[in-house]
Amino acid sequence: LPAAFDSFTLLHLSDLHLDADPAYPAALIEHLRQVTYDLCVITGDFRAKTHGPHAAALAALAQVRPHLRGPVYAVLGNHDSIRMAPGIEALKITLLLNESVPVERGGSTIHLAGIDDPHYYQVDNFDKVAAHLPPEDVSILLSHSPETYRHAAHAGFDLLLSGHTHGGQICLPGGIALMTNAACPRSFCQ
């Protein structure tokens, strides 16, 4: 990282499934009060169901958003619908749908990029998102699924942040994932 980004901290949230339990937004807000960070990223799955109404998830996100400090960037997950995008962006959360943004600090720049979830709609476009990234700059890719790791590496991204595996759905002692819900190495799902 450029020296200007020493001590720069990202808060990475994923798989919030905000409409799964009415008590969840308040619990999340309580945890958010205890952390310090410069920028927040959310790697999808704002809602619990993969189809149907999404108003409850957006209402819960509206409760949480005032407690997220700094800029907030996100990608959609396999539970989310593009129909949610206007509601998410109305909350001042920037969705990165096969696009990137520069993040500047102290005269230096890193790039934050996001791709669409590869599962249902299969509209993730690595060529488009990586096309304008300077190879000498640090680039971070947001992807809901860690299964994109090979594409991310070939596209030249320095870091991939993803969710989807819920830390490995079922883990043995020591954090060894038995079930990952992803077609990638288990070590990528922790």
Would you name each region that the model predicts?
Residues 5-12, 18-190:
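Soluble catalytic domains of enzymes that build or remodel membrane lipids, polysaccharides, and related
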